[in-house]
Amino acid sequence: MVQPRFVRPTQSSPSSISGEPNSSNLYVANCGPAVGLTHNAIAAVFAEFGEVNGVYAADDSGVRVIVSFADPFSAKAALEALSGRPCPDLKGRSLHIRYSVLQLPSETQVNDCVPVSLIDSELNIPGLFLLPDFVTVAEEQQLLAAVDARHWIGLAKRRVQHYGYEFCYGTRNVDTKKRLGELPSFVSPILERIYLFPNFDNGSASLNLDQLTVNEYPSGVGLSPHIDTHSAFEDCIFSLSLAGPCIMEFRRYSVSTWKASTTDAEKSGDSSCIKKALYLPPRSMLLLSGEARYAWNHYIPHHKIDKVKDKVIRRSSRRVSFTLRKVRNHPCSCKYPQYCDSQQQM
């Protein structure tokens, strides 16, 4: 959900006591969707005092909103007329109103200053493709309902489900001798659509994806930088984003080994790595193949908010990803030996 972020003015800000309005934005408590008042209905009432740019949820309660006017004098007029009084046009509710100011998150809170692209071609990473609206809203709800009806495995900060083969986080690999069975039927439509993936020339007709990991990320939880172990999976990795958006950052280090990064310096990146970031909207499918799969770390910052171009995007309460892969049954012989566990061990 894209929305501005508002906070209470500081004590040093001009106040209404001085006779001058200090903001064109009002924090309004005791009204909202949770008590049967839509944002449009609220906007119509406040529009009597001036042009309303928008009405936004102030938090997740459903009973507190931000009313943003085009100018501060309209906000002042509305505050003086409505605050502390029952409003007949809003079901007679008494409104509690104060000024609010717009505040963008600090640079350290959003994307670590890495510019975010909206389309895959802007990154210029060979083998990386993003297809928006890969599934419909109805299909998204069906997929979420299907996994929510099944058993989740709790990890430290997220929940997972494994199908086909279990992914072992300790070794970052799979045990090919312990197959869990066929992939569930609810992913069949996804598999059929994957074989028609645009720009996919890696033998899709013969690709037999046989491993699925479903991850549920609460708001603010991301993913540490890593390259999927070369010996564990074949070339193509597909990741479907559901329920919420995120920023995925890609990092290529000038010096690297196949071992998973463990130090804080490696996790945060350093001057020897190239960083690029891509916005993954809900219902989009990401394909990592070739160089993108074998040589670039992928990473989801641990943020509750992200900055995309000039907009601040608040992450939803959950994001669910479906990652589909083909288990490898032979050593990897890719063109990127410095990142390859198979070739490093030869």
UniProtKB/Swiss-Prot annotation:
Compositional bias ranges of the Low complexity kind: 12-21
Region of interest called Disordered, as start-end residue ranges on this chain: 1-21
Keyword RNA-binding listed: yes
Record domain RRM: where: 24-102
EC number(s) on file: 1.14.11.-
Enzyme class: oxidoreductase
Alphabetized UniProt keyword annotations: Dioxygenase, Iron, Metal-binding, Oxidoreductase, RNA-binding
Coiled coil: none
An example Gene Ontology molecular-function term: metal ion binding
Record-level GO BP terms: demethylation; tRNA wobble uridine modification
Similarity annotation: Belongs to the alkB family.
Protein name: Alkylated DNA repair protein ALKBH8 homolog
Native source species: Arabidopsis thaliana (Mouse-ear cress)
Name of the coding gene: ALKBH8
